[in-house]
């Protein structure tokens, strides 16, 4: 739960912009080129634009936002994108409102409050590794907090590795003219993760408190080879094959987690 600071009387609108960004990775091993192609096809169908639209629609509901517009696209040969414009105020139906215009709050939000997702399936040309990355951004302006959707997004995708960034920008002014650069308590994104998620992941923080920048990355603690094999079972592999595949997968996970290639 997002813990607010003591209630402030504001001069006008809350102009704080809060942005939460995810890079979520699913890692897989597919032995043959045909299996790798089927993995790409599976991921492409599992996370097509329709499914992603439903996930982002759920996010909007969770954070208490109103949907203004939805744009979505499936790409050839693979990948999908969805962008949803949101506001914290109800949208006025112009037909029902007569000559009344859409409220200033809605107009103010349209360039700042949005939820987007882009997917990137890919495979290694030789070693059998296949990965799926989903980039998700939830940006809000006002009292709505994107942190409320944190746990839902992690659970909605096959999240072997999760890289998260949260930042607060701008300021809001109280009735005495004092500027406030953040309106809730936070010292880590981990504060907002559910206990069952924290128990499953190894986590690492890099935070710049004075700049209202918070970074958390995490990967699953337990390694079960069967969870990473596509159309295959570990029991059907020789010991030597299992060790080789496990080493490849663990190296891939480490490199994605640290964001760099590791030395041989």
Curated annotation (Swiss-Prot):
Cofactor: pyruvate
EC class (word): lyase
Cofactor binding, note field: Binds 1 pyruvoyl group covalently per subunit.
Record keyword S-adenosyl-L-methionine present: yes
Top-level taxonomic group: Bacteria
Active site: 113, 118, 141
Catalytic reaction annotation: S-adenosyl-L-methionine + H(+) = S-adenosyl 3-(methylsulfanyl)propylamine + CO2
Sequence positions bearing Pyruvic acid (Ser): 113
PANTHER family membership: S-ADENOSYLMETHIONINE DECARBOXYLASE PROENZYME
Record-given protein name: S-adenosylmethionine decarboxylase proenzyme
Organism field: Stenotrophomonas maltophilia (strain K279a)
Record gene name: speD
């Amino acid at each position: 739960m997002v813990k607010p600071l003591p209630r402030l009387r504001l001069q006008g609108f809350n102009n704080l912009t809060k942005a939460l960004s995810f890079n979520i990775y699913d890692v897989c091993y597919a032995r043959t080129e045909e299996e790798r192609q089927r993995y790409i096809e599976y991921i492409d169908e599992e996370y097509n634009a329709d499914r992603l639209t439903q996930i982002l629609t759920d996010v909007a509901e969770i954070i208490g936002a109103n949907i203004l517009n939805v744009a979505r696209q499936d790409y050839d040969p693979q990948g999908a994108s969805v962008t949803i414009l949101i506001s914290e105020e109800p949208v006025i139906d112009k037909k029902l409102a007569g000559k009344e215009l859409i409220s200033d709050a809605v107009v103010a939000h349209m360039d700042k409050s949005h939820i987007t997702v882009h997917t990137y399936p890919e495979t290694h040309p030789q070693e059998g590794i296949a990965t799926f990355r989903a980039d998700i951004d939830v940006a809000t302006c006002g009292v709505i907090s994107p942190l409320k959707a944190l746990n839902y997004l992690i659970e909605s995708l096959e999240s072997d590795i999760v890289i998260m960034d949260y930042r607060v920008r701008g300021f809001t002014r109280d009735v005495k003219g004092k500027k406030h650069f953040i309106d809730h308590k936070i010292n880590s994104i981990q504060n907002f993760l559910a206990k069952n998620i924290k128990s499953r992941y190894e986590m690492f923080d890099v935070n710049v408190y004075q700049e209202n920048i918070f970074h958390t990355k995490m990967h699953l603690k337990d390694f079960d080879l069967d969870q990473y094999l596509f159309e295959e079972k570990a029991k059907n592999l020789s010991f030597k094959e299992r060790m080789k595949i496990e080493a490849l997968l663990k190296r891939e996970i480490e490199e994605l987690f640290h964001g760099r290639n590791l030395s041989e």
